[in-house]
Amino acid sequence: MRRQLLTYALLLAVMACPVWAQQAPMKLWYTQPAAHFEESLPLGNGRLGALVYGNPDDDALVLNDLTLWSGTPIDPDEDKGASRWIPEIRKALFAENYALADSLQLHVQGHNSAYYMPLVTLHIKDADACAFTNYRRELSLDSALAHVYYRKAGVNYQREYLASAPDQLVAVRLSASKRKSINVQLTLSSLLDHQVTTADGQLTLTGHAMGKADESTRFCSIVRVSHRDGTLTATDTSLVLIGVSEATVYFVNETSFNGFDRHPVRNGAPYMERAADRARQASRLMYDDLLVRHLADYRRFFSRVSLTLQPGVSSCYDDLPTDSLLRSYGTRSECDRYLETL
């Protein structure tokens, strides 16, 4: 009986508490597009990563893949006898014969490490390039969604970005307050050796990591689009949307990486077939279903822990964009706590 009374008392106490633990929005937000890498908004699903720059006229979405590296497997026994040079190197160092030590260390150095490679950049170019107002770019930490809002020629535009782990893709949803107001061109580029093709409403970029084509990890990036109203046409190297009310851009990628100890070409994974399968699956997706799966998966991890450093919901979120909060850190206690929570 005493235990039951204690349980009821605890429940009543919790119900009577004010909602001071409610968190302010867990968002980073800015009033201008990103001009540099450090200003972009990162998204990722554990394999694919994306950086959102958010320029309304030419939006760059810089993408990478966890498995895209330079180099090839190395024989683990290649430097098996390297340890015998260590005493000689130490002897040279103690004798301050640094030139000799430097030459001897070549016997134990082995091959250079592989380099992590950039993948591609997806450009969303607005055909109606003109002045924009009411700009806002944000990243929601509690949903792993990025947004860009702006106004052009009396029309409000919104772009929503996500990197889905369940569906292994990156998606961008374009919408506008006025029907048939979206006019954009989609292109793919890469700093690596590559070629771009279009077919059946699909944009494809294939290439390989730094090095010889027959020795390097290969990759295939595909963009597909679903849209409402308007038209979707293709040039040799781009997809063009005209008079569209709403569109979803799907990006998928696969590489020939097949394990750290397997050659990426001779024993590589079937990256072309896998990318084509991913693209076909993406084209059958409804964006709302994709979003629900993404949120359920992400929040399963993010919601395990929450942090509150102050009572009440801070007004600092609405008062100042994140870069201004950083510059004013140390001058407003309430805002400092909110920034630290972020």
Predicted features by range, described:
Residues 1-23:
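Bacterial Sec-dependent N-terminal signal peptides
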